[in-house]
């Protein structure tokens, strides 16, 4: 993240402006290619979530796209239809824009692949992927890892939003 690099440069006495300029250029180019009439041209939950999370949209656009993101999840039966990168941002975005209830319903959903589904099938740690019981070529898939941290964004959500334990700022603040 170029804005984080700018912050680190400032903290270490280096020039932050090259990073800030790069961030502005990235945002400008992203918007020129992917934003039309205030809407993201790619209509997938990962694209929406990441564009909102990274500040690529203006606030009014982000609010409208967060509502669209929420509706996609509701329409999909309260299930995540994204991969790792979408999972990284979706908890923060939906909570920030007032859709924590949708997240809760999605996380606790036992009917579709996800966190609740895994727990309802005996998992007490995070599997490598949620589709651990999908049959491929007549055989069940094998979950290689039953303690896969990369899907643990839900843990951060529990601490930061449900329990209210939040990081005060970047670094050691």
Residue locations for each model-derived region?
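Active-site core of glycosidic bond-cleaving carbohydrate-active enzymes
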Residues: 1-173
């Amino acid at each position: 993240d170029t804005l984080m690099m700018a912050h680190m440069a400032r903290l270490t006495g280096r020039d932050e402006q090259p990073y800030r300029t790069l961030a502005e250029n990235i945002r400008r180019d992203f918007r020129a290619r992917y934003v039309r009439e205030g809407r993201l041209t790619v209509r997938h939950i990962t694209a929406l979530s990441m564009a909102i999370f990274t500040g690529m949209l203006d606030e009014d656009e982000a609010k409208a796209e967060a509502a669209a993101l929420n509706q996609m999840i509701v329409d999909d039966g309260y299930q995540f239809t994204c991969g790792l990168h979408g999972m990284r941002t979706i908890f923060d975005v939906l909570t920030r824009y007032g859709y924590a209830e949708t997240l809760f319903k999605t996380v606790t959903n036992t009917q579709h692949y996800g966190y609740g589904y895994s727990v309802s099938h005996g998992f007490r740690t995070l599997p490598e992927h949620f589709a651990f019981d999908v049959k491929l070529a007549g055989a069940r898939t094998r979950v290689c890892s039953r303690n896969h941290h990369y899907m643990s964004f839900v843990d951060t959500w529990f601490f930061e939003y449900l329990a209210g334990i939040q990081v005060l700022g970047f670094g050691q603040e």
